[in-house]
């Protein structure tokens, strides 16, 4: 029974070896897939600077933010337009036909024997110009000439028939308490200007974010390409070991188990190559999306070859200097300051609304009457006929709860805006400190991972020499090959992470544009 079980186990092992050998045979499926020529794809080279410029020109997030920024300029014009003068003109024709029960200015005899008809026709034009003043008041200039005629049997009772009249009037209304003063009147213009400045820095912040994302993605493309080379080198080393083991097994100086171990390693590393190649394509698509090509181009298979190589030199960094630069240049600081200014303006306006409404109203006018239009104008401008008046209007809502509630609300908003500025400064300081530590740590990782890679190379070389003289096994060699590939990948990751950390630090200092000598207009 034990002998039969041993024979069965040997045959199962042999069958498994044959099947694995067929699958991994260079002339069959796995070897065929790896060695098969892929369809020709369009390849493009791209530098980091080119990627940044293309993103500035075409990125959708930047375009959306740019349009929003421009719309804030329109808000300023809308507020300023409230002080534009308004011209209006009104023309009318009226006819009145009424019965009379009495004489009209001696036009009829002392005794009325029947109803007398009063037929009056008038044509008038009113020209009006009005504008709001920066002091909070309003001025209105009105000119209203008219022509009036009555039926002939009554014409004797009038000096002129038809008669021409003209009225020229100037009216001024000026608040003295609520809504009085240039500062109060221009509150919403200043708020709109602050909002426009805020949106400009929101746009700048969006640009910096997109450029930082482009940089991060670009370095991930670099890592993916280099990582594929590591995976291919590991696969090649496993294939060479498999070929050597097969030759030794055929010569009878190596066991079948060593061949199986090498074949399993090849299969595993084929999978790693496939995954690494997919990672490249994924990162390339992410980078292309950030550059916003046309949809037709995005549908096509385009391979991007990065031209820039990651730096491995340590840049001198002063933590306090980095914090000062960030405080000076970060868009969020300007946004918080302008929001605080707008809150103060709104608070002052709300405080003004607590006052009673006291307005001065003054008017003066000239009148004229003539037999024709020219005569009417001359008499109108002669100054012989005039009117004027002045007065004060006072109103105050009892309790004034709405104004007091608004004022309290604006005070709270102002306190929140002030606290937000303090919070933003704290966040920037903490963010810069973390970014500086990350740069320093990642640079040290480069040194340590490089040392680990060198040691892994030496260990693999020594283990291969031991295998040649029969002092080691395939499993140990494969383990050291795997350790070397891992060490190489770790060094690549540390190098790319260091460059991403430099990008992150520039983003925290808001100096990303300076890296490319770019300025936003």
Locate the predicted segments by residue:
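Amphipathic alpha-helical coiled-coil segments
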Residues: 64-79, 206-230, 240, 247, ...
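Sec/SRP-type N-terminal targeting helices
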Residues: 63-67, 80-81, 134-165, 177-201, ...
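Acidic, low-complexity, intrinsically disordered peripheral segments
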Residues: 9-13, 30-40, 95-97, 285-298, ...
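Bacterial Sec-pathway N-terminal export signals of envelope proteins
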Residues: 31-122, 172-187, 191-193, 218, ...
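Hydrophobic, small-residue-rich alpha-helical packing segments that form membrane-like cores
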Residues: 164, 168, 176-177, 181-271, ...
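N-terminal secretory signal peptides that target proteins for export/translocation
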Residues: 1-11
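Bacterial N-terminal signal peptides
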Residues: 15-26
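Small/polar, glycine/serine/threonine/aspartate-rich low-complexity segments that form flexible
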Residues: 37-43, 90-170, 305-316, 348, ...
């Amino acid at each position: 029974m034990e002998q039969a079980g041993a024979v069965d186990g040997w045959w199962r092992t042999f069958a498994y070896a044959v099947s694995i050998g067929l699958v991994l045979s260079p002339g069959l499926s796995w070897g065929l897939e790896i060695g098969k020529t892929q369809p020709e794809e369009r390849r493009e080279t791209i530098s980091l600077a080119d990627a940044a410029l293309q993103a500035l020109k075409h990125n959708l997030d930047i375009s959306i933010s740019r349009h929003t920024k421009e719309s804030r300029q329109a808000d300023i014009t809308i507020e300023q337009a409230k002080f534009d003068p308004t011209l209006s003109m009104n023309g009318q024709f009226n006819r009145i036909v009424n019965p009379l029960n009495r004489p009209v200015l001696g036009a009829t005899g002392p005794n009325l024997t029947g109803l007398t008809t009063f037929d009056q026709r008038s044509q008038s034009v009113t020209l009006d110009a009005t504008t709001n003043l920066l002091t909070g008041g309003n001025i209105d200039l009105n000119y209203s000439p008219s022509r009036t005629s009555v039926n002939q049997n009554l014409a004797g009772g009038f000096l002129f028939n038809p008669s021409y009249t003209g009225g020229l009037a100037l009216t001024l209304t000026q608040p003295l308490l609520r809504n009085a003063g240039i500062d109060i009147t221009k509150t919403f213009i200043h708020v709109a200007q602050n909002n426009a400045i805020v949106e400009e820095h929101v746009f700048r912040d969006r640009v910096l974010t997109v450029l930082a994302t482009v940089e991060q993605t670009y370095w991930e493309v670099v890592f993916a390409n280099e990582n594929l080379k590591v995976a291919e080198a590991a696969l090649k080393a496993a294939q060479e070991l498999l070929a050597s083991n097969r030759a030794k097994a055929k010569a009878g100086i190596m066991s079948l188990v060593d061949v199986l171990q090498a074949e399993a390693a090849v299969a595993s590393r084929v999978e790693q190559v496939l995954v690494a190649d997919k990672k490249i394509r994924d990162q390339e698509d992410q980078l292309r999306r950030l550059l916003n090509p046309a949809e037709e181009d995005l549908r096509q298979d385009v391979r991007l070859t990065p031209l820039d190589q990651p730096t491995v030199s340590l840049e001198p960094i002063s933590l306090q200097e980095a914090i000062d630069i960030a405080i000076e240049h970060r868009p969020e600081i300007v946004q918080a300051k302008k929001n605080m200014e707008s809150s103060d303006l709104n608070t002052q306006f709300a405080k003004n609304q607590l006052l009673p409404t006291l307005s001065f109203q003054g008017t003066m006018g000239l009148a004229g009457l003539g037999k024709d239009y020219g005569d009417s104008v001359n008499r109108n401008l002669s100054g012989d006929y005039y009117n004027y008046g002045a007065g004060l209007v006072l109103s105050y809502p009892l309790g004034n709860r709405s104004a007091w509630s608004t004022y309290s609300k604006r005070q709270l908003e102002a306190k929140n805006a002030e606290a937000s500025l303090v919070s933003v400064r704290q966040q920037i300081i903490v963010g810069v400190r973390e970014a500086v530590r990350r740069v320093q740590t990642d640079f040290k990782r480069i040194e340590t991972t490089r040392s680990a890679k060198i040691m892994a190379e030496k260990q693999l070389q020594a283990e291969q020499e031991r295998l040649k003289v029969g002092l080691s096994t395939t499993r140990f060699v494969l383990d050291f090959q795997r350790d070397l590939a891992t060490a190489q990948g770790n060094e690549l990751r540390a190098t790319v992470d260091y460059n991403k950390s430099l990008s992150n630090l520039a983003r925290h200092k808001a100096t990303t544009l300076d890296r490319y000598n770019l300025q936003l207009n």
